[in-house]
Amino acid sequence: MNLSFFDQFLSPSLLGIPLIAMAIMIPWLIFPTPTNRWLNNRLMTVQSWFINRFTYQLMQPMNFGGHKWATILTALMLFLITINLLGLLPYTFTPTTQLSLNMAFAIPLWLTTVLIGMLNQPTVALGHLLPEGTPTLLIPILIIIETISLFIRPLALGVRLTANLTAGHLLMQLIATAAFVLITIMPTVALLTSLILFLLTILEVAVAMIQAYVFVLLLSLYLQENV
């Protein structure tokens, strides 16, 4: 019974063909593309306002060199939010609960920010490995610690997103199962459990959006250090 709770995190397949690629492509079909041939409706207006506000808040603390990343980070933000929210629907699959997918986003983007710093400002980039004013005896130890913390960054990005979404989905399934079992035995308790499930669902919607924002925000902070 305990193992069945994790079946929702298995990559679905049809006739031996994995369907995770279809789940990844669906978000791009949801957002309408602006065009000059038609007037913008309310959905397009809200979408444009959200993208502009997010891009402004993300790029404001950066210098001009980091503004080239605005399109990539905004697209990644919309992609993660859409996948996370679609995964809350019944009988759906959430690709971002797979650590492999999150690491596939985290490692290349983090590595790109590091390479940009090494190519453009090698002295400043290497200076991050040694805090200013460090005693001579602590220099080797601190360099090792800072190097390890540097390489842990992509792992922290991927694991944070995976762990939060996985924990939320498991908790929702546990409470939903309890409500379903108790509905014939103790209807009052089942009603209270359903209310808790409703509140938890609202919380998970917020977590789905917040975790996507945190993922992109941390990438922008890593980029800000190297541009």
Swiss-Prot record:
InterPro entries: ATP_synth_F0_asu, ATP_synth_F0_asu_AS, ATP_synth_F0_asu_bact/mt, F0_ATP_A_sf. Keywords: ATP synthesis, CF(0), Hydrogen ion transport, Ion transport, Membrane, Mitochondrion, Mitochondrion inner membrane, Transmembrane, Transmembrane helix, Transport. It catalyses: H(+)(in) = H(+)(out). It is found in: Mitochondrion inner membrane. SUPFAM superfamilies: F1F0 ATP synthase subunit A. The keyword tRNA processing does not apply. Pfam families: ATP-synt_A (PF00119). It comes from the Eukaryota. GO terms for cellular component: mitochondrial inner membrane; proton-transporting ATP synthase complex. Gene3D superfamilies: ATP synthase, F0 complex, subunit A. One of its GO terms (biological process) is proton transmembrane transport. It is a multi-pass membrane protein. The chain crosses the membrane at residues 14-34, 69-89, 99-119, 137-157, 180-200, 202-222. GO terms for molecular function: proton channel activity; proton-transporting ATP synthase activity, rotational mechanism. The keyword Membrane applies. Disulfide bonds: none annotated. Belongs to the ATPase A chain family. Subunit a, of the mitochondrial membrane ATP synthase complex (F(1)F(0) ATP synthase or Complex V) that produces ATP from ADP in the presence of a proton gradient across the membrane which is generated by electron transport complexes of the respiratory chain. ATP synthase complex consist of a soluble F(1) head domain - the catalytic core - and a membrane F(1) domain - the membrane proton channel. These two domains are linked by a central stalk rotating inside the F(1) region and a stationary peripheral stalk. Component of the ATP synthase complex composed at least of ATP5F1A/subunit alpha, ATP5F1B/subunit beta, ATP5MC1/subunit c (homooctomer), MT-ATP6/subunit a, MT-ATP8/subunit 8, ATP5ME/subunit e, ATP5MF/subunit f, ATP5MG/subunit g, ATP5MK/subunit k, ATP5MJ/subunit j, ATP5F1C/subunit gamma, ATP5F1D/subunit delta, ATP5F1E/subunit epsilon, ATP5PF/subunit F6, ATP5PB/subunit b, ATP5PD/subunit d, ATP5PO/subunit OSCP. This is ATP synthase F(0) complex subunit a. The gene is MT-ATP6.
